[in-house]
UniProtKB/Swiss-Prot annotation:
The chain crosses the membrane at residues 7-27, 67-87, 105-125, 127-147, 150-170, 178-198, 201-221, 239-259, 570-590, 609-629, 633-653, 670-690. Disruption phenotype: Morpholino knockdown of the protein results in developmental delays at 18 hours post fertilization (hpf). At 48-72 hpf, the tail is slightly curved and somite boundaries are also abnormally curved. Swim bladders are incompletely formed. Glycosylation of alpha-dystroglycan (dag1) is severely reduced. Widely expressed. Has particularly strong expression in testis, ovary, brain, liver and heart. Pathway: Protein modification; protein glycosylation. One of its GO terms (biological process) is regulation of eye photoreceptor cell development. Its main location: endoplasmic reticulum. Belongs to the glycosyltransferase 39 family. This is Protein O-mannosyl-transferase 1. Transfers mannosyl residues to the hydroxyl group of serine or threonine residues. Coexpression of both POMT1 and POMT2 is necessary for enzyme activity, expression of either POMT1 or POMT2 alone is insufficient. It is found in: Endoplasmic reticulum membrane.
Length: 720
């Protein structure tokens, strides 16, 4: 019982330096984040989606997966934001009901914690706490990172998860076999999933870590001290944590996203009819009570499965193709058939049995099956859908599609079409409303009814061209159609049938669509549907990022010279470029000399330098070079993940030079003086640019002109 008398004690180690830099980071990122109380640059973009999120309205953002929006929505939810604000312009004042501080809080916290994470990464790479402190100092005083952290933007959140993923993998790699070894591996997989879930750019660092893990796993396989069972276990756990877990989490983001956003929204028409029908208040409103099976006599609207260039419906109207086109080619002068991107009474067609004259559904209904031959009669003009060996107006390599008019010339009707249900489960599959994807094949010519994507001239009312494609091969969404609105025709009399076509369909049901079907469709749309790219005043090329030849004006006060710019610490950016070159020269020199059996540094220092290069130089490269291949509008802030890894490289190269290259005490003292001078210059640059970083105080025009350190920088000066 003597042990009971002993005091219970707990020993806790506190890294005071780490706590200090974390506190400083929180101060630099959180100080005055409610200012300005106005929309700042891309807040106008993310804010629109945030409002839709708060109202649980479906939307598509092709810029990235939904997890980033969920994070911003969490801040909005905690602040009590109801989504009622119109995000229509940069500089718009936030009313009192918009919790500005809460909306900007999570990005600011993420940006703050990037600083201690950088400290831990440098230490985990095997470098001194002094070097880690240097990395923190550079990040603390990096104006561009501060600006991007202080507003409702996602780059700081992305960088936080990337650094956490790198730190977790390094700790896993260095840990001995224990619970914490596998804990860090799981954290790495989770962080990678979060990073990718915020922005697709997270894939770059994920692939870097996967490559590093593959190399380490290959070395593990060659370890003869491990049994086959242990090797298999190690490989399996790595695969589960770094591949399977991120995939499951990525799917989970979309599952939550689609569960939360269940209401019809502004982007519905980009999705398939089945997807739209699954949203509350959207297509479901007009599809309730529709017959599921398409039958002879059915009145239908046919929507193209493809969303390119826009979703549209098979359409015809009382206007003919011109006798001759502008280029002198002749047409059939038949009635125009187009694809129209709006709901209209002229989108209705009647599916007719070629062997019967009746235009109504029989009792019982005779369903249309895969392989059946049909005629399509335009409901309002009673012209049959027709194609023939006449060149289409905008796509002369394809056949013209028309509503057949008998001009008493040697041009007989060719209006028979074969129904090919592409997603059928059996050869006798019945054509289903919304669910079936159908290819309509012309019986006479084997041409497929297809949306060409071209727009007709003024004579075609700028509607989209529909053609008969004789060289159609494989699965092409432009040649797939589905029945969206559907009713059983009941009237044989033309006047009564016209009234029937103009009457609304029934109202409010959900069509069941599995999560995986919705996920695959949404993911495909996000990757393929792009908004029209337009030149932006502040867009830039990756070559301009290296030397920061550009900046971005984020906000300007409506009456004073107070303004906020995305602009970096020019001393840090220049130093980073120099250390990248120095690292490459060092690496190549060591590599060539080691090839000649000359070892300038110990083996463990060489391995340390290589690993640091893979993480930092590799992190910079994978987050920078891919932008040269992208055809999209790019901005300077896209460089931030690469910049972060480049900054980590600076103290690493500095320490290596100090210890392994500069041998004498005099050289080291002189180099120490250079380091101190650079840090002072970094601070002076940060301090000078801080009015443009924080937006206050407002400077005079003369002071602003003095901050234009490069001719290419766009500093805003008010005209007197």
């Amino acid at each position: 019982m003597q042990c009971v008398k002993l005091p219970v004690s707990v020993t806790v180690e506190i890294n005071v330096l780490l706590l200090a830099v974390t506190a400083l980071a929180l101060f630099t990122r959180l100080y005055g984040i409610h200012f300005p109380k106005a929309v700042v640059f891309d807040e106008v973009y993310y804010g629109q989606f945030l409002s839709l999120y708060m109202k649980q309205v479906f939307f598509i953002d092709e810029s990235g997966p939904p997890f980033g929006h969920m994070i911003l929505a969490l801040g909005a939810y905690l602040g009590g934001f109801d989504g009622n604000f119109v995000w229509n312009r940069i500089g718009a004042e936030y009313p009192g009901n918009v919790p500005v501080w809460s909306l900007r809080l999570i990005p600011a916290l993420a940006g703050s914690f990037c600083v201690p994470l950088a400290y831990l990464v440098v230490v985990e790479l095997g470098y001194s706490h002094f070097s880690a402190l240097g990395a923190c100092a550079l990040l603390l005083m990096e104006n561009s990172l501060i600006v991007q952290s202080r507003f409702m933007l996602l780059e700081s959140v992305l960088i936080f998860f990337l650094l956490l993923a790198v730190l977790s993998y390094l700790r896993f790699h260095k840990a001995r076999n224990s619970f914490f070894k596998w804990f860090w591996l799981v954290i790495c997989g989770v962080s990678c999933a979060f990073g990718i879930g915020v922005k697709y750019m997270g894939m770059f660092t994920y692939f870097l870590l996967l490559s590093l893990a593959a190399v380490h796993t290959w070395q593990l396989i060659g370890d003869q001290t491990l049994s086959h069972g242990k090797v298999m276990f190690q490989v399996l756990v790595r695969f589960l944590a770094l591949v399977v877990l991120p995939v499951i989490m990525y799917l989970g983001f979309f599952y939550i996203h689609l569960t939360l956003l269940y209401r019809s929204g502004p982007h519905d028409q980009m999705m398939s009819s089945a997807f739209q029908a699954s949203l509350e208040g959207g297509l479901a409103r007009i599809t309730q009570g529709q017959p599921l099976d398409v039958a002879f006599g059915s009145q239908v609207t046919l929507r193209t499965v493809s969303g390119k260039p826009v979703p549209c419906w098979l359409h015809s109207h009382k206007a003919n193709y011109p006798i001759r086109y502008e280029n002198g080619r002749g047409s059939s002068h038949q009635q125009q058939v187009t694809c129209y991107p709006f709901k209209d009474v002229n989108n209705w067609w009647i599916i007719k049995d070629p062997g019967r004259q009746s235009l109504v559904v029989s009792s019982p209904p005779k369903p249309v099956r895969h392989g059946d031959i049909i005629q399509l009669l335009h409901g309002m003009t009673t012209r049959y859908l027709n194609t023939h060996d006449v060149a289409a107006p905008m796509s002369p390599h394809s056949q013209e599609v028309s509503g057949y008019i008998d001009f008493n010339v040697s041009m007989p009707a060719q209006n028979l079409w074969r129904v090919d249900i592409v997603n059928r489960e059996s050869e006798k599959e019945i054509w289903k409303t919304i669910l079936s994807e159908v290819r309509l094949v012309h019986v006479n010519t084997s041409a497929v009814l297809k949306l060409s994507g071209a727009s007709l001239p003024e004579w075609g009312f700028k509607q989209l061209e529909v053609v008969g494609d004789k060289i159609y091969k494989g699965y092409q969404q432009t040649g797939m159609w589905n029945v969206e609105e559907h009713r059983y025709g009941r009237s044989q009399e033309p006047k009564e049938r016209e009234l029937e076509l103009k009457s609304p369909t029934h109202s409010d049901v959900n069509k069941n669509l599995t999560f995986m079907a919705k996920f695959l469709e949404l993911q495909w749309k996000m990757l393929t549907v792009k908004n029209e790219e337009s030149e932006h005043k502040y867009s830039s090329s990756p070559l301009e990022w290296i030397t920061m030849d550009t900046n971005i004006a984020y906000w300007l006060h409506p009456s004073s010279n107070a303004q906020i710019h995305f602009i970096g610490n020019i001393v840090t950016w220049t130093t980073g470029n120099i250390t990248l070159v120095v690292y490459c020269l060092l690496f190549l020199t060591y590599l060539l000399r080691r090839r000649r059996k000359v070892e300038d540094i110990p083996q463990d220092s060489w391995e340390q330098l290589v690993l640091a290069g893979v993480v930092c130089l590799g992190g910079w490269a994978v987050n920078y070079l891919p932008f040269f291949l992208m055809e999209k509008t790019l901005f300077l802030y896209h460089y931030l993940p690469a910049l972060t890894f480049k900054i980590l490289q600076i103290p690493i190269v500095t320490e290596h030079l100090y210890i392994h290259v500069l041998r004498s005490s005099a050289q080291q003292k002189a180099f120490g003086g250079v380091i101190l001078a650079v840090l002072c210059s970094v601070y002076m640059s940060y301090h000078s640019l801080s009015p443009l970083t924080y937006g206050q105080p407002a400077l005079t025009s003369d002071k602003l002109a003095e901050l234009r350190w490069r001719e290419s920088w766009d500093i805003l000066l008010r005209k007197r």
